[in-house]
Amino acid sequence: MSKEKFERTKPHVNVGTIGHVDHGKTTLTAAITTVLAKTYGGSARAFDQIDNAPEEKARGITINTSHVEYDTPARHYAHVDCPGHADYVKNMITGAAQMDGAILVVAATDGPMPQTREHILLGRQVGVPFMIVFMNKCDMVDDEELLELVEMEVRELLSQYDFPGDDIPVIRGSALKALEGEAEWEAKIIELAGYLDSYIPEPERAIDKPFLLPIEDVFSISGRGTVVTGRVERGIVKVGEEVEIVGIKDTVKSTCTGVEMFRKLLDEGRAGENVGVLLRGIKREEIERGQVLAKPGSIKPHTQFESEVYILSKDEGGRHTPFFKGYRPQFYFRTTDVTGTIELPEGVEMVMPGDNIKMVVTLIHPIAMDDGLRFAIREGGRTVGAGVVAKVIA
């Protein structure tokens, strides 16, 4: 089968369905692909194709995730759907499937349920920037007042977690009826697609963000100076520009005097490229793996942050026993491990393998970080958990 050429003409946006079990996330995913394929072209995906989600590994954690793609006239979407609640938790925390926006599915027959709340909270913690609500199964509710009530509850819940509950689009539909080809419900899927286009802003591309390169290796080249190597995470570095070396030690300024890739000299290094950057006036021993090279002032070193963490179960190769408040594992950021201590939420005495939990982490060395940075929790090089920086404290 020949691969279709990927058309780069339209903006690309990553979305996903979230919400309580059996509220119709997967049916909606199937309905979106089917109705949009019928309306705008593209290929439909059946419910069972999406439901049999393949296993993936992200940061050593196995996650079942389905990826589908669809197009509106304005955009190309990559959409992620997970079969089980645990898969959502893992997916959102590891950032395996980053979402520029999420479709929160709430069954009109049930209203918001515990996982509805948990997914909204997770979305807030891990930095899902926009939510759109699809009220599903509206064909099964005759009472207009009941629909109003459910909508109000969902909006209040979103506002509780700092989403703009009053402004978020709420579409009342029926994924199943749309999938079965009933025109009035198909129209609701088109309405949803319209909101995906208009309500979720086009994401900023990695190349347009401020320059950052996690340092993997440091060499000294006689007569030329010190070279650091790594993959540019975002932005562009040009020869002659000032850069900062951030993390672990005090922040130091330098100038990029050369960029090379595969032994060839370039005038810049761009997001996604593996490059060597030559630094002026820096000694080999002043710099180490785990620091980052960044645009001056764009990122700061921190030691303390609030995080959302998933602890691997025994079956996933994680711990066999719970841990308690004196726990001191390593936190692996980008290219290096840093030891840290943890503070558990009030009333939580221990954390079991397979749990997800909010915790405050204090590191023994500062690391360059922003909200949304992902990390692994390790014990002697073995991954036992995954986390995301929800909020930098100090």
Swiss-Prot record:
- Annotated region (G4), positions in chain: 136-139
The Swiss-Prot or TrEMBL record describes its family as follows: Belongs to the TRAFAC class translation factor GTPase superfamily. Classic translation factor GTPase family. EF-Tu/EF-1A subfamily.
Q: Which SUPFAM superfamilies match?
A: EF-Tu/eEF-1alpha/eIF2-gamma C-terminal domain (SSF50465), P-loop containing nucleoside triphosphate hydrolases (SSF52540), Translation proteins (SSF50447)
Q: Check the record and name the PROSITE patterns matching this protein.
A: G_TR_1, G_TR_2
Q: Where is this region: G1?
A: 19-26
Span list, region G5: 174-176
Binding of Mg(2+), residues:
T26
Instruction: Report the EC number(s), separated by commas if there are several.
Output: 3.6.5.3
Reactions that this protein is recorded to catalyse: GTP + H2O = GDP + phosphate + H(+)
What quaternary arrangement does the UniProt entry report?
A: Monomer.
Task: Using the UniProt record, name the top-level EC class of this enzyme in a single word.
Answer: hydrolase
InterPro entries per UniProt: EF-Tu_GTP-bd (IPR041709), EF-Tu_GTPase (IPR050055), EFTu-like_2 (IPR004161), EFTU_2 (IPR033720), G_TR_CS (IPR031157), P-loop_NTPase (IPR027417), Small_GTP-bd (IPR005225), T_Tr_GTP-bd_dom (IPR000795)
The UniProt record gives the binding positions of GTP as 19-26, 81-85, 136-139
Name of the molecule in the record: Elongation factor Tu
Name its species. Pectobacterium atrosepticum (strain SCRI 1043 / ATCC BAA-672) (Erwinia carotovora subsp. atroseptica)
